[in-house]
Structures are given as C-alpha cells and as structure tokens.
C-alpha cells in the first residue's frame, strides 16, 4: 500500500512543484479578492465553512470535504505570490524618463480635457520621486527609476539572465521580486491616488455633436498605456508593431521565472512555487501561459 501511495506522490510531484494561476474576468468580477485569498499565509486564517465527514447532502459537499481535508493536512497549503498585472503595466512608465511621461500626458490631453495639466505633472513627479520639485524642466531627462531600468536592460540583453542567477545572487533576486510584487504596487497606488479623483471629458471631433464621453483619468490613462504596450511595446506609442503584442506578458513571465528561480535555489529538490497573476484580460496573454 505504501508503494502505491509513493507512486501516486511521485506522479503528482511535478504539479506540486509549480502552480501558476492566472485569474481572468472583468473589472469588479472578484479577481483581486481571489488573489488576496490565495496570498493568505495560513489556511486557518481563511473564512471557510467547516467540512463534513459524513451525511453529505450532495456531491459538492463531498468534493469540498475532500479538497479541504487534503489542503489542511501535512502543511500542504502554501500562500501564492501575487503578480499584479496593472502594476507591471506601470513598470513600463517607471523605466522611462519624466519627459516621456510628460509628453504622453500632453498627448492624452489632445483626446480628453485635462484641467491644470502642468500642476498635475508636478504632483505626479513629487509622488514618484518622493521629493518636492519646484521646476519639472530640471528633471525631465532623468529616468524615473534607474534601478528598474537597469534590471530591464539585463533581462532584455540576456534571455537566460534569471536562470543564470546563483545562490550568491539571492539578495538581488529577493530584491527584484519584492520590487515587482510589493514596491511597485505601492508606487502605482500613489500614482492612482493623484489621478483617481480627476474626471475628464472627451474632446469632441465634431463641433456639432452634443454627446461627449466622460472618464476617470486614471482608468483612461492606464487603459491607453496597456493598449499601447500590447501594440508597440512602448507605453507612449500607439503604432502597431508585429511581435510586440506579447511584450507585457513576457515581462510578467520574467517575474514568474524570478519567483521560481528563488524557490529552486532556496529549496532544491523540494520546490513548491505558488504564483497568482491578477489578472489576465487578453486572450493572447492567457494562451501564452497555457502554451507553457
């Protein structure tokens, strides 16, 4: 019996080594809520109903009991590291210069009416740099996040960069993972707070038209940025460039590789990588991970 149990364990070992869940659904569908549940440290901290051991009313109760007991035993539960797709979109802004960002805000202002645009630019700079800025012209040629730009350069120049990292690189690997899963989320939320309260009106292309759309500036801005990245590989360029439609998902995959590499180095032969992507909105991006 023990041999059979060991054989089953061996069969499912590969699945246990690496689990990647890509959440998908419209905004407000509950993807972020699910991601928070998956990133919970301990299964006992989850607000789950008790599982039955007998007197099942229907098959779903029985299935729930089996899954619950399986996950609760032998410390099988391990929290998932969450990669927030919107924050990875935001990273494309941070790796560039302030001038790129200013120019893109100017470009957006040709599409929607942004009041006090120059003041908004100044506020954004102060949020991103965490410093008081009197004259934004003085810093416009600076890269917003130099460290991020260096990391991206390494990833672009060497497709095997993550796989080449060794135990002596653990500190750097941890630093990169923390940046992409925590620090950049904080930076994006600060940026969001500056734009989220601003409502903008679409500039009418037809002077006779009385109907114009109204948008939340943050949502409009990030949607445009995401579309451009998927189209050209650059957040400020809306041209269609063949091969660039997977630019965003390739970066997400680089972060997946980082998390998996850290697990390999820290727990050799006992790896249990758990990753959740919140969220995939594009069918090509979903297929990209399915193919892997």
Label each residue range with its predicted role.
Residues 1-278, 282-292:
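Glycine-rich phosphate-binding loop of ATP-dependent small-molecule kinases
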